[in-house]
């Protein structure tokens, strides 16, 4: 395996000019406690994208983490967004208040996560659930697959029924969690049983239009990142544009698979239209870890200043099966990770030129670094990849 670093081409006009990308702790920041259940964090439109980091909290879609006590809600939040080791989550205390976590370090992975205590009483007159649900983009209900889930299914039905009546545009996601201790057959049977019972309860209540999405998850593998990627993608209005840009890029560059990663959380916010192979996704996640770890050792200055990931970040890893992993910085918190064959990588000049066009298009979509305050009602037009090269020949349009 070889690891190479190279200097990025001339920075794009309008690109961010900060010397450092990530803070030294390389994370999203300190968790904020929500002191009152019905206070603060007002609601933007259900599945709409948030404004830039400088925008008001009310502009950001919310993701609610709900479920019974000890189902793993806080562990999921800590592992995905705060880089906590899964083994350390064993020492987390049970949540007894609503905690709000502001995820706003990039131009579009920009939302709030509200972690709810296990026994939330919707009939408590002091709990304004209508206000909370009205400003929510997605509700994630976590079910412990290793425990008796009948009570969890009852609470799931009560929760999604009330939420749907307040905000029918909300996305409803069910994490069948802690499946690492189950056999493959048991996982499939548990998912089938929970899926059947939950949808039967909704049908009996006349809520056939309410759609639940189910995911098998564990914090001890990449399944929780894969599931959260799917949840976050539904909150990104620019997702079709991103997928289209990735499809154009890989088809003109001889690349087999490409992911657009949020580097901090390792959530992929977009990929091309080909099916996602879990092994490929895990390989790309591991590459990000390797690049950041090596950069932290060799890329920082003697006084510890600098950043492990910045506008010059680029890495190539060649595997012994003729597969090449190629990572390039796209924006301040985004990286493009590609999987391709060694023979395709011989045309690196073509790939780099097409990547430059792709990167410029991404900057145009999100206007990264142009302004920190953008009205949420403003809709940025999606650019096309002009002058993209195919087989080494530039052309005016695609």
Curated annotation (Swiss-Prot):
One of its GO terms (cellular component) is lysosomal membrane. The activation of RagC/RRAGC is mediated by a GTPase activating protein (GAP). In high-amino acid conditions, activated by GTPase activating protein FLCN that stimulates RRAGC GTPase activity to turn it into its active GDP-bound form. In response to amino acid depletion, the GATOR1 complex inactivates RagC/RRAGC by securing the GTP-bound inactive form. InterPro entries: Gtr1_RagA, P-loop_NTPase, RagC/D. The modification Phosphoserine is found at residues 2, 15. The keyword Phosphoprotein applies. It comes from the Eukaryota. CDD domains: RagC_like. GDP binds at residues 70-75, 177-178, 180, 219. It is found in: Cytoplasm; Nucleus; Lysosome membrane. It holds the Pfam family Gtr1_RagA. The keyword Metal-binding does not apply. Expressed most abundantly in kidney. Moderately expressed in brain, ovary, and testis, and detected at lower levels in heart, liver, and muscle. Not detected in lung, spleen, and small intestine. Widely expressed in tumor cells, with expression being specifically up-regulated in highly metastatic cells. Residues 1-56 are annotated as: Disordered. The modification Phosphothreonine is found at residue 95. One of its GO terms (biological process) is cellular response to amino acid starvation. Keywords: Acetylation, Cytoplasm, GTP-binding, Hydrolase, Lysosome, Membrane, Nucleotide-binding, Nucleus, Phosphoprotein. The modification N-acetylserine is found at residue 2. Its EC number is 3.6.5.-. GO terms for molecular function: enzyme-substrate adaptor activity; GDP binding; GTP binding; GTPase activity; GTPase binding; molecular adaptor activity; protein heterodimerization activity; protein-membrane adaptor activity. GTP binds at residues 73, 89, 95, 180. Belongs to the GTR/RAG GTP-binding protein family. Guanine nucleotide-binding protein that plays a crucial role in the cellular response to amino acid availability through regulation of the mTORC1 signaling cascade. Forms heterodimeric Rag complexes with RagA/RRAGA or RagB/RRAGB and cycles between an inactive GTP-bound and an active GDP-bound form: RagC/RRAGC is in its active form when GDP-bound RagC/RRAGC forms a complex with GTP-bound RagA/RRAGA (or RagB/RRAGB) and in an inactive form when GTP-bound RagC/RRAGC heterodimerizes with GDP-bound RagA/RRAGA (or RagB/RRAGB). This is Ras-related GTP-binding protein C. It comes from Mus musculus.
